[in-house]
Amino acid sequence: MKFKQDFFTQLPEFYAQVYPQGISNPHWLAWSEDVAKLIDLQQPTDALLQGLSGNAAVEGASYYAQVYSGHQFGGYTPRLGDGRSIILGEALGPQGAWDVALKGGGPTPYSRHGDGRAVMRSAVREFLVSEALHHLGVPTTRALAVIGSDMPVWRESQETAAITVRLARSHIRFGHFEFFCHSERGQADKLTQLLNFTLKQHYPHLSCDLAGYKAWFLQVVQDTAKLIAHWQAIGFAHGVMNTDNMSILGDSFDFGPFAFLDTFQEDFICNHSDPEGRYAFGQQPGIGLWNLQRLAQALTPVIPSDDLIAALNQYQHALVQHYLMLMRAKLGLAERADSTAEQDQQDLELIGRFTVLMEKNQLDYSNTWRRFGQLDPSSAHSSLRDDFIDLNEFDAWYQAYQTRLGKVTDIEAWQQARNSVNPKYILRNYLAQEAIIAVEEGNLAPLERLHQVLRQPFAEQVEHEDLAKRPPDWGQGLIMSCSS
């Protein structure tokens, strides 16, 4: 790997230098060829294994943990930072630079009495979800590899340490700006310094002045809205939408007790530590705005409040428009040129009626959408009908749907288009759990198989049909712990 060290050299007060502590008996558990190409890596070598496991130095790496704060479950925590993630620097590749981080690389000054380690199950889950979301077309950080060990660590019980090698376009979070506004009061110069760095690195078309800052914040609002529209359309619950887990670039970031929906449930909670459902699936759009408001609050020393409010007021429109675009594609509805607010509302109601039907009839979210690939939209009798209990309610919806759809001339092309946006394969929690159990037993084949299938989520892959089925009773709607 070839590195540049812009964050390390230009923002010395934004991190602590810390070196990883190696794990014993490191070995590859997973490797992504797709991600390796992003930073010009060819294959997983033993020398690379030693470097990424913290047992040897990586040439050109600087090793540091960033400091930030954040709102966690609505309350402000003044000092967080990378408690177990150590960044090597920005690795250069054909499509630009990527931060390379060792998640689980050992304790840092921000570990807050933690051991700085990640357990194998959480490392595997982060690897799988990073790659699954990417191949579904959802903005996300990436995962190069999972490195296992025989090092014991203790959570609810004894587990084994592992490292996820994460790649990110940037590790700058909402919480970085919060730290230098709230926790380090009177540090407006640091906010400006961080803003200028962010613009030069990721928004070079914007000027480092008030006009540029205003345009940048509006872009953050729009990117965040688009990200959450993706989550809602694909049926993804993040689980821990704290402001320190929000990427400034609108990428899915810092995965813990996430879940893809099995049976559609608007109020689904995937996080065992969230009994009140603050971060439930249906709450994510509102939390996205709440988090942006916290970011705006942190930016008031450098951007006037009126300008911040004006940008925040664009959030709902951006969210709805992107959500409509994604959902119209899932349903096969033509995009309306210059659609009116009334027409958009009609489409939202049509979509909402269908998801309510899915919830009332306890239908699998992804599999139901996939069925549109076999639907003859010109037929008065829908092949979906047998999935529903309340046939009168479904028939009323289907009639409204056909009216909005209009005439379809090439049914086969229409069906293929539905299969290109409605995935057959998603990372169901029970599939991840089965792969983790197999790894614990020394069998990497299920993990590799699942990884490869998730690289082509829209393809039929008939030899892997079992991975597209609804989960068994034990695997339905699994709720995960935050411990990792």
UniProtKB/Swiss-Prot annotation:
In short, the EC number is 2.7.7.-, 2.7.7.108
Co-factor requirement:
Mg(2+); Mn(2+)
Q: Which reaction does it catalyse?
A: L-seryl-[protein] + ATP = 3-O-(5'-adenylyl)-L-seryl-[protein] + diphosphate; L-threonyl-[protein] + ATP = 3-O-(5'-adenylyl)-L-threonyl-[protein] + diphosphate; L-tyrosyl-[protein] + ATP = O-(5'-adenylyl)-L-tyrosyl-[protein] + diphosphate; L-histidyl-[protein] + UTP = N(tele)-(5'-uridylyl)-L-histidyl-[protein] + diphosphate
Q: Which terms in the Gene Ontology molecular function aspect does this entry carry?
A: AMPylase activity; ATP binding; magnesium ion binding
Q: InterPro entries this protein is in?
A: SelO (IPR003846)
Enumerate the UniProt keywords alphabetically: ATP-binding, Magnesium, Manganese, Metal-binding, Nucleotide-binding, Nucleotidyltransferase, Transferase
Record-annotated active site: 244
Function in brief? Nucleotidyltransferase involved in the post-translational modification of proteins. It can catalyze the addition of adenosine monophosphate (AMP) or uridine monophosphate (UMP) to a protein, resulting in modifications known as AMPylation and UMPylation.
Q: Which family does it belong to?
A: Belongs to the SELO family.
Name the UniProt record assigns to this protein: Protein nucleotidyltransferase YdiU
